[in-house]
Amino acid sequence: MRSKLFVPGSRPELFGKALNSHADAISIDLEDSVVTERKADARSFVSLFLQSNEVLASSKIIIVRVNGLDTPHFAGDVESVAHARLAMLNLPKVESADDILAAVAVLERAEAQAGIDTPIRLLANVESPKGLRFANEIAAAHPRVAGLQLGFIDLFEPLGIDRYDKANVHAVMLAVRMAAGAAGVFAYDGAFPDVQDVGGFRAEAAMARRLGFLGKSCIHPRQIEFANDVFTQEWDVAYASRVLSAYEEAKARGAGAFLLDGRMIDAPGVRRAQAVLAASKGTALSGE
């Protein structure tokens, strides 16, 4: 999931275009991009889209960001979008393990009502000081948690922190990546607001990639190709293939560690190579 294109839930005319884009995933939003008066309409639009033939025929990863647990819209959102083709439910402003457990309870009821057998996973947004503080607990709260996603604007702006300062961004990225890594789930980079600043987008995506993030959110179609490019580096893919080939040879010899280009590689390096190859194919939902 190198790239994930954001689509407002109140704009159904954009759903099909997003589905046919080069993004590995689409994230339809019912939260901030939809005004209160259009919440019900957006919910219906998304529900119908998830049941459409074009979605059923597509292999695109589909995510829906619902309204927060502390809003009157949450339960209705979950009940409306709980469909078999929904890969993940994106939870905004998660601040504790209890938030995850509360969301799971609502989701389980919705799945039972809809007759869904395969559990829908959760992508938890870290976008508040409290959420950042408890990121470890959030990531490990329940097996449904697939990953942690950064929300820089909600995290930084209320505190007067410069969202474009690379040191600020790096510090939060590293903390969230470590929390995700400890729980064995992926970390996903947030949106870059300036759609005209290609260099800034690429630089931030490259920073996330170096920290082991799975991919980056895109708020405009023009950002997709840059996210895909940054998170699919040919040298990395080729090297990952060599790592796995060398691993198979070492395994046949009964060795758990081996040398490649003078560098010792063991189980963590093999897992990283597997993740790189999965991400290059746009199939990964796990960063470990």
Question: Where do the language-model regions lie?
Answer:
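Expand to "…catalyze enediolate/carbanion chemistry for C-C bond making/breaking, isomerization
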Residues: 1-288
